[in-house]
């Protein structure tokens, strides 16, 4: 389930951002695919998606069998990381800039790097979120300008 708290054209919806609540599992790859669909209709030439993540995709629903892998698999660990990284690459291939603010365990640092590469800022406290997002935005502006 992907809940839009504020639409691109919504001029008065800032307060709804605070309606967010964690509701269970996080199938990151699917959420990224959904964001890609939403961003296609966004009225802008350039798109930047910044995520707050623990880099630990996990879902109770298994990954369905495919031609390469005939058995279903759990959506956690390496399969979840691989799926999420593939969706990040797909968004970037569509021209959507993807960056992440990582607030997770030390054991998840390799996953964060595998998924987001150099477009990543780590924070240890939530009060560092705005500064980290600001740095990522500045990096993107510099890259687009240079």
Region annotations inferred by a language model:
Residues 1-146:
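Acidic, glycine-rich A-domain
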């Amino acid at each position: 389930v992907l809940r839009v708290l504020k639409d691109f054209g919504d001029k008065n919806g800032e307060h709804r951002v605070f309606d967010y609540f964690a509701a269970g599992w996080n199938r990151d790859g699917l959420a990224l695919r959904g964001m890609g669909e939403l961003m296609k209709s966004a009225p802008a030439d350039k798109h930047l998606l910044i995520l707050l993540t623990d880099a630990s995709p996990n879902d109770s629903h298994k990954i369905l069998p495919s031609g390469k892998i005939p058995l279903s698999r759990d959506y956690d660990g390496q399969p979840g990381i691989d799926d999420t990284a593939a969706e990040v690459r797909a968004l970037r291939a569509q021209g959507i800039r993807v960056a992440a603010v990582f607030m997770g365990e030390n054991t998840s640092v390799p996953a964060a790097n595998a998924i987001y590469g150099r477009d990543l800022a780590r924070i240890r406290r939530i009060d560092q979120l705005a500064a980290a997002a600001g740095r990522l935005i500045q990096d993107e502006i510099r890259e687009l300008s240079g």
